[in-house]
A protein has these predicted regions:
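Mature extracellular or lumenal effector domains of secreted proteins
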Residues: 1-131
Length: 131
């Protein structure tokens, strides 16, 4: 898909739809293509804030610490935020985003252990638009 491997952009607009609720977030991150920021698996940081990620899915939940945002986060979240119940990021059990590593949950929210709003497995439909 040429929009993945050959289209430069200044920002991403990501949308997450659960049921009839669709919410959006703007991610300022200029790059030569989405392929260039994801395919090599290298971690690339951006920040839109924990609260913005939580606002994408009503009732979503994250652990309180770590809060790494970006591309190719810890444990294979392609675009999103990972959180942990410990101050380090070595064993995160929660995420909101796209390309999540859990079977049947590639976009959405998962949280286990010490979650802000209880354990979650929320499957979502994701949109990634480039500008």
């Amino acid at each position: 898909m040429s929009s993945y491997w050959a289209m430069p952009f200044q920002s991403l607009c990501v949308g997450v739809k659960v049921g009839n609720n669709l919410n959006w977030a703007l991610i300022p991150y200029p790059a030569s293509s989405l392929y260039d920021v994801i395919a090599d698996g290298s971690r690339r940081t951006f920040t839109i804030g924990r609260n913005k990620w939580l606002s994408l899915i009503g009732g979503s939940s994250l652990q309180p610490y770590c809060n790494i945002e970006g591309f190719n986060n810890v444990l294979a979240v392609r675009i999103g935020i990972r959180s942990n119940n410990e101050n380090n990021c070595n064993s995160p059990d929660s995420a909101i985003g796209f390309g999540l590593p859990w079977s049947g949950l590639t976009c959405g929210n998962r949280c286990r252990i010490s979650c802000s709003k209880g354990d979650k497995d929320v499957v979502a439909f994701g949109y990634i638009l480039i500008k």
